[in-house]
Amino acid sequence: MLAPFACQPGESRGRQKPESMSTFRSPFQRDRDRIIHSSAFRRLKHKTQVFVEHEGDYYRTRLTHSIEVAQVARTISGVLGLNTDLAECIALAHDLGHTPFGHTGEDALARLMEPYGGFDHNAQAMRIVTRLERHYAEFDGLNLTWESLEGIAKHNGPVEGPLPYALAEANAQWDLELHTYASAEAQVAAIADDVAYSHHDLHDGLRSGLFTEADLMELPVTAPAFDEVDALYPGLEPMRRRHEALRRVFGRMVEDVIAVAQGRLEAAQPKSVEEIRQMGATVIRFSKPLYQELKVIRSFLFHRMYRAPSVMKERAKVTAVVNDLFPLFMARPELLPQEWRRDVEAAADETTLARIVADYVAGMTDRFALQEHARLCG
């Protein structure tokens, strides 16, 4: 049974294009299923978060990460009486707008798009689900419910200041109330992202040899976990020791989020999702002690993983790939695939063309971007 402050599927604000109700699935289940079956979701299989060529087995892809985020979101939302389908839907959609080559690729594309309104992966996810997926006879995009769109747009909180192009375009159509907080389900999806990447980046970094268990014995959160495992299982083989320690780190993060949320919900006693949106602060968050400890972990990961020599070595290379492909397609849009030509021919100005080229480049997988660069620029 859903809590009164959960998003009730029978009270959805609906879809841009009205559709008949499904006999067997709720509106949010249909949204989730459409995301899973989308082309953009499938492409996440070949997009890495940390790009190191020839070392892909060590690192999560955007697809595996999204699945892990969805699992965490379902767990937390289920305990809190929230709508697990909506939380899962937003979690699965949160990375759809990412470029090839992780944040390095996004930084390069964002710089190239500065004269044309910029580029932001969260806004690009909105563009994908409202416009770029073209599989249905009656609409472009996925025709998601308002609640799913709201969660994609502002799962990280109210959106202030100048809006990225894609988000401004979507908000003009749907009025996503960007000045308010999102539903509790969207907040759960956001913190599930933090839980998942904090956990799996530690795991991936250990597997790839960027740091060792001894390094983690010097850090908060991880050190007590290894101490507990060593006390319970002296002499445990390294791989099992590592897994047992990191699953305890993972469990502590999830339990902390649930405990804090239960306390805040008990204190606020919200009677509806609208009261959640108007609370003026997130109801889903880490406790202050754990948040401070996780800041230490993130700083460690930034220096030892995201700025590791093997990762930095690739940054210039993949930046060049994006820097070469974007202006090439701008100058010669006829090189774009046939299915993109209609949009190119309809482009009224250079800014519109740049947005089309950015859509195409952002949709590339790591492997395809490298192949296209070798073919067209080699």
UniProtKB/Swiss-Prot annotation:
Family matches, as Pfam families: HD, HD_assoc
HD domain boundaries: 62-198
Keywords: Hydrolase
Positions of region (Disordered): 1-28
Organism from which the protein derives: Cereibacter sphaeroides (strain ATCC 17029 / ATH 2.4.9)
Cross-referenced CDD domains: HDc
InterPro entries per record: dGTPase, dGTPase-like, dNTPase_2, HD/PDEase_dom, HD_domain, PHydrolase_assoc_dom
Protein name per the record: Deoxyguanosinetriphosphate triphosphohydrolase-like protein
Protein's UniProt keywords contain Hydrolase: yes
